Amino acid sequence: MLGLRLIVGLGNPGSEHTKTRHNAGFRFVDGLVQREGQRWMLESKLFAHVARVFIAGQWVWLLRPVTFMNLSGKSICAGLSFWKIKPEQMLVAHDELDFPPGAVRLKFDGGHGGQNGLRDITKLLGHGRFHRLRVGIGHPGHKDRVVNWVLGCPTCEENIAIDAALERASAVLPLVVAGDFDEAMKKLHTVV
């Protein structure tokens, strides 16, 4: 399996969205940038902030679209084309309603599952053959409450659980970057 060359965090731009559940993907890549002592740089032709981090002996691009979630594909496709990266070499970190806060899972391929950022990416790519980091944010219990839920801020307890999940995901990232996706999944998905 090909190793990773690009990690994307999904979220919505603007200070009013910074701490929302929907920005779990941004939280993941922001954590990587901070941990590695890097800085985001605006790359207007990619409609994104970009950074590079050194993981598992190689440089990996990080991309944080400046478009809203439902238009993320434009930025991602621009990045893939500009850096000549195959979708199979990309990991997209996003919020996941189907998992409780604190749960985090890796997945390769599939549909969008109702996640609007993934919907736009798969539409523009024409397929879903890329890696995903699914960060649990919980579900409000009824589909009519989903929009307010994802655009709302997690509770203190939920934030602690989400942060712990992002730390666990960061710990297996060297395996993912090196192309050992199965081992990364085994470590991340095994509850000790």
Curated annotation (Swiss-Prot):
Catalytic center residues: H22 (proton acceptor)
Record: residues binding tRNA: H17, F68, N70, N116
UniProt-listed Enzyme Commission number(s): 3.1.1.29
GO terms for cellular component: cytoplasm
Major site of localization recorded for this protein: cytoplasm
Keyword Protein transport attributed: no
Claim: Cytoplasm is one of the keywords in the record: yes
Discriminates between blocked and unblocked aminoacyl-tRNA, annotated site positions: N12
Subunit structure: Monomer.
Record protein name field: Peptidyl-tRNA hydrolase
Organism of derivation: Xylella fastidiosa (strain 9a5c)
